[in-house]
Amino acid sequence: MMMGKEDLGLSLSLGFAQNHPLQLNLKPTSSPMSNLQMFPWNQTLVSSSDQQKQQFLRKIDVNSLPTTVDLEEETGVSSPNSTISSTVSGKRRSTEREGTSGGGCGDDLDITLDRSSSRGTSDEEEDYGGETCRKKLRLSKDQSAVLEDTFKEHNTLNPKQKLALAKKLGLTARQVEVWFQNRRARTKLKQTEVDCEYLKRCVEKLTEENRRLEKEAAELRALKLSPRLYGQMSPPTTLLMCPSCERVAGPSSSNHNQRSVSLSPWLQMAHGSTFDVMRPRS
C-alpha cells in the first residue's frame, strides 16, 4: 500500500497478441469510489476488488527480472510468428533427418540413372551390328576374300546385292552393310593419310624454293647498290700518245692518225676528236 501511495500514476502494461496493453492504475479515484460507498452492497464489491489488486501486486514484482518461463510465455504470446518459425524449423529438421536417413535412396537413384544412360549408349553402339551380333563379327578367310573382291568391284551395294551376298556368306544383310561401311571408312582414312604425306612433301619443296628465292633476291639487291659505289669513285686516268711521236713511228702508223690508250673500259674516246686541237695547222 505504501508503494501505491508513493508512485502515483504508475501503470503496468503487458503486451498480448491482440496488442491491447493491460493498464493498472494504482491511483485511487475519488469520484467513483465516493459514489460506490453510498451503497452497502457496493462496499463489499470494492473491498473484494481491493483484495484482488493487492494479491496481484504482491505476485508481480516490478524490480525483479522475469523468469525464463515467463519470457517464453510472453514471447509466445507477443510474437505470433514464433509458432510459424518453430514449425518451419521443425520441418527443416525433419527433412534433414529424412535426407540423411534416405541419402542412400538418392545415391541409388543416381546410380540407376547412370546405369540406364550407360546402358542406352552401349545399346546404341552395339545396335549397328544388329540384334543378333552383340559381339565383334569374326569372319573366315573365305568370307573376307569374297567381301574384298566384291568391294573392289562395287564399294556400295543395293538391297538385292546385300541379300544375295549375305545368303552366299551365311550372314545377315545388316552385317554385310556394316562391313562395307567400315571398309569405306578405312579406305577414306588411308587416302587421307596419303594426301597428307603428299602435302607435307609439297610444303617441304616450297619451303626450299622460298629460301632459294630469298637468297637470290638478296644478291640482286646487293648488285643494285654496287653502281652507286662506283659512281662515287674518281674517274680513271688515261694515257695519250703525242702526234709527233706517232709521225716518227713510220708508215705503219700512217693509217692511224691517233692512238689512245685507256686504262678504263668505260671511257672510249673518238678517233681524231682529241688530237685535232693539239695538231699544228699546216
Swiss-Prot record:
PROSITE patterns: HOMEOBOX_1, HOMEOBOX_2. One of its GO terms (cellular component) is nucleus. Residues 132-191 bind DNA. It is found in: Nucleus. The keyword Nucleus applies. Keywords: DNA-binding, Homeobox, Nucleus, Transcription, Transcription regulation. The keyword NAD does not apply. One of its GO terms (biological process) is fruit septum development. Residues 71-134 are annotated as: Disordered. Interacts with BZIP30. This is Homeobox-leucine zipper protein HAT1. The lineage of its organism: Eukaryota, Viridiplantae, Streptophyta, Embryophyta, Tracheophyta.
